[in-house]
Amino acid sequence: MYKEIYLVDDEDLVNTVNAIHFRRMGMEDKLKSFTNPELALDDLRFRDDPNVKTLILLDINMPEMSGFEFLEFMMLEDFPETNKVLLVTSSESDEDREEAKKYDKYVKEFITKPLQIEHLEEFLQGSYS
């Protein structure tokens, strides 16, 4: 089971809606929400235990830093594989899907917005088994 869940999207409303999904599943105590991906990266870098099993819902298109740039930092800094990423995006671009494959060490799903609670539940059930 994930000990921490990071919501990383430049739109606060999107993070709020995604947080509601997790609250409905009784996971509100695990949530951390960021509208600035750089702050999310810093939080991941400087945690007490970097090996905590963490789920990161990551938007691709953000003004400060794209989701792919975020993933590039994770790769360059060799973040532990206990960090699993769900790319959540409004893009259905084949190019974005191909780009995501470069980060398959971390990226476990590519989900089109809006995030459906059923899809999230399926992913969580599959990742726990």
Residue ranges and their predicted role:
Residues K3-L13, N18-F22:
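Conserved acidic segment of CheY-like receiver
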Residues V8-D10, F34, I56:
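Conserved sequence signature across two-component system core domains
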Residues S33-D42, G67:
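Helix N-cap/capping motif at the beta->alpha junctions
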Residues D42, F68-F79:
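Short amphipathic alpha-helix used as the core "switch/output" element in two-component signaling
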Residues D48-L57:
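Active-site beta3 strand of CheY-like receiver
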Residues M62:
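Receiver (REC) domain active-site loop signature in two-component systems and cognate sites
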Residues E69, E81-N83, E92-E109:
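Alpha4 helix (beta4-alpha4-beta5 surface) of REC/receiver domains from two-component response regulators
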Residues P114-L124:
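C-terminal output helix
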